[in-house]
Design a protein with these regions (language model features):
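Glycine- and acidic-residue-biased ligand/ion/polar-headgroup-sensing regions
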Residues: 1-10
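Regulatory inter-domain linker segments that are low-complexity and enriched
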Residues: 21-48, 75, 95
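Alpha-solenoid helical-repeat scaffolds
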Residues: 67-86
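Tight coil/turn sites that cap or link beta-strands
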Residues: 9-25
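Helix-turn-helix repeat elements of alpha-solenoid scaffolds
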Residues: 60-65, 127
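Long, helix-rich interaction regions
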Residues: 43-55, 80-82, 99-237
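Long, low-hydrophobicity ectodomains and other hydrophilic envelope-associated domains
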Residues: 7, 26, 31, 138-139
């Protein structure tokens, strides 16, 4: 959270900006800068709806030092879905993944699923504390499938896609657990660029034909990463 205010000096003096920043741990600092901070500049490029969402979220934040408590309350009780999802993603950045995982088990959030799965995947850095927290959040929702779903969220080569990992993603499309269907489908979609007219929020028994098309792609070794994914992967050391 932060507020930036411009303080104009007397004529002939250089304009200065006083920046007040409240950090997640509750500490506050006031600095004088020559220009507005990067986070403020970014906030000016938000759409009208994004600005409204941000204002709604800030309105429910208290002056307490525990911002996580405020964000949890916003996620659990706010009337606007967009505010709830932003609160969940803020908590994710603070290392709390339970709220964002809950959204993947709720069809009301279907419009946010792709961005959320992508955001979680970006947190999958081996050796980081996030890995343990993601695994713990998945464990209570996916049970025995936790390990394979965690693998789905990581990087994936063509060989893995055409091997056991790809098979697990396709199998996940038929899961009774919505979260597993959501992650399996969105990872397949993002990697291959295909959908096969599959919808993770629908009962898998109603999507037999779509699932069979995915199964056939895997059997024929035609599950391949689209060019955009390969180009991005080549930039990662």
């Amino acid at each position: 959270r932060g507020v930036a205010a411009v303080q104009k000096g007397s004529e002939g003096t250089e304009q200065a900006v006083q920046v007040t920043t409240i950090q997640a741990n509750g500490t506050m600092k006031i600095t004088t800068e020559k220009q507005l901070p990067g986070w403020y500049q970014t906030s000016q490029n938000l759409s009208a709806s994004q600005q409204q969402t941000a204002q709604e979220l800030v309105a429910v934040l208290s002056d307490s030092s525990d911002i996580s408590t405020d964000l949890r309350k916003a996620f659990e009780t706010h009337r606007l879905l967009q505010v709830k999802i932003v609160a969940a993603r803020c908590l994710m950045q603070l290392g709390e993944f339970n709220p964002i995982m809950d959204t993947l088990n709720n069809a009301e959030y279907r419009s946010t699923w792709e961005d959320s799965v992508t955001a979680i995947s970006k947190c999958m850095t081996p050796g980081e504390m996030n890995m343990e927290q993601i695994t713990e959040a998945l464990q209570s929702r996916a049970g025995d499938q936790t390990e394979v779903i965690t693998e789905m969220l990581g990087t994936c080569t063509d060989e893995q896609l055409q091997g056991d990992l790809g098979a697990a993603m396709v199998q996940g499309l038929g899961s009774t657990v919505m979260l597993e269907r959501v992650i399996s489908f969105i990872r397949l979609k993002n990697l291959t660029g295909k959908t096969q007219m599959y919808f993770p929020d629908k009962n898998p028994h109603q999507q037999v034909a779509s699932i069979r098309r995915w199964q056939q792609l895997w059997t024929d070794k035609k599950l391949q990463r689209q060019a955009a994914v390969i180009n991005v992967s080549s930039l990662i050391p």
